[in-house]
């Protein structure tokens, strides 16, 4: 699942509106909506703003990248 959709799911689970996030971050609602629906990539700066508005760490919606083990 992409980061935007994870954020959208988090918002829905916690009763937080996209308008609230847009107002707290300064990201236009239309732009935010496109990102949360997977139709636009989030910039890292926007991602940081969203995490700050939600009071969560920037690792909240990211999947850990597991390095490939060579020779195993």
Across the structure, where does each feature detected by a protein language model lie?
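A short, Lys/Arg-rich alpha-helix, primarily the initiator
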Residues: 1-17
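Short, charged recognition helix plus adjacent turn
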Residues: 9, 15, 34, 52, ...
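DNA major-groove recognition helix of helix-turn-helix
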Residues: 11, 36, 46
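Short alpha-helical "recognition helix" segments of helix-turn-helix
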Residues: 21-22, 50
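Recognition helix of helix-turn-helix/homeodomain-like DNA-binding domains
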Residues: 27-41
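Short, basic-rich loop-to-helix N-cap that marks the start of a DNA-contacting helix
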Residues: 39-52
């Amino acid at each position: 699942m992409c980061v935007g959709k994870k954020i959208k799911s988090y918002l829905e689970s916690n009763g937080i509106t996209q308008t609230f996030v847009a107002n707290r971050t300064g990201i236009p609602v239309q732009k935010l909506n496109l990102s949360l629906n997977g139709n636009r990539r989030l910039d890292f700066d926007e991602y940081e703003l969203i995490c700050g508005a939600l009071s969560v760490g920037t690792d909240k919606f990211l999947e850990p990248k597991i390095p490939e083990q060579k020779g195993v």
